[in-house]
Amino acid sequence: MGNTVQTDNDFMQMQKPFALFAKWLEEATVSEINDPNAMALATVDKTGFPNVRMVLLKDFSPQGFVFYTNYESPKGQEILKSMKASLVFHWKSLRRQVRIRGIVEKVTPQEADAYFQSRPRDSRIGAWASKQSQPLESRFVLEKAIARYTTRYAVGNIPRPPYWSGFRVKPLSIEFWCDRPFRLHDRLLFTRDSVEHVDWKRQKLYP
């Protein structure tokens, strides 16, 4: 695959998880075929069953990992109930993985508005037209809704739907995994007791 696997003296010596994540994401941006910011988002429904789906990371900082969605969708409702989530990034081209567990908060309306207005116009129309994850009688019904909202918002800015916004996952743990021969992989775990803490505990793990 042409990938370069980091050695123990490289990422296993890193002290700051967000700096390491930024480095890995930057390298994945070069090597991944598409969507290096794709991540698996895991939530739990009211019966205790887990659900997982792919979403796109839109921003990250020491404050957390941000993505946007329809709050009325199953993932939105599950997050709003528990305010907890897990994320996984898997970069096959680099043979690396990052696992994140944390507490979730809503982004501010100002953040959501700014990101929504940065999206392509057709995507903004789609946010109004799609009743995400609800039963759809036919594609034609969706296309009619798209046409209706295209006409409604033919001129000027398209406002953000009240049910469409973002979440920020504030991590309590971040684990970095790197493939090594014979499944003797490198694993580095950062943990903290509270999302308010800026200091992280750092621990190497057996494969």
UniProtKB/Swiss-Prot annotation:
Catalyzes the oxidation of either pyridoxine 5'-phosphate (PNP) or pyridoxamine 5'-phosphate (PMP) into pyridoxal 5'-phosphate (PLP). It catalyses: pyridoxamine 5'-phosphate + O2 + H2O = pyridoxal 5'-phosphate + H2O2 + NH4(+); pyridoxine 5'-phosphate + O2 = pyridoxal 5'-phosphate + H2O2. GO terms for molecular function: FMN binding; pyridoxamine phosphate oxidase activity. This is Pyridoxine/pyridoxamine 5'-phosphate oxidase. InterPro entries: Pyridox_Oxase (IPR000659), Pyridox_Oxase_CS (IPR019740), Pyridox_Oxase_N (IPR011576), Pyridoxamine_oxidase_dimer_C (IPR019576), Split_barrel_FMN-bd (IPR012349). GO terms for biological process: pyridoxine biosynthetic process. Homodimer. It comes from the Bacteria. Binds 1 FMN per subunit. NCBIfam families: pdxH, PRK05679.1. Substrate binds at K58, Y115, R119, S123, R183, L184, H185. It comes from Bartonella henselae (strain ATCC 49882 / DSM 28221 / CCUG 30454 / Houston 1) (Rochalimaea henselae). Keywords: Flavoprotein, FMN, Oxidoreductase, Pyridoxine biosynthesis. FMN binds at R53, M54, V55, L56, L57, K58, Y68, T69, K75, Q97, Q132, S133, W177, R187. Its cofactor is FMN. Its EC number is 1.4.3.5. Pathway: Cofactor metabolism; pyridoxal 5'-phosphate salvage; pyridoxal 5'-phosphate from pyridoxamine 5'-phosphate: step 1/1; Cofactor metabolism; pyridoxal 5'-phosphate salvage; pyridoxal 5'-phosphate from pyridoxine 5'-phosphate: step 1/1.
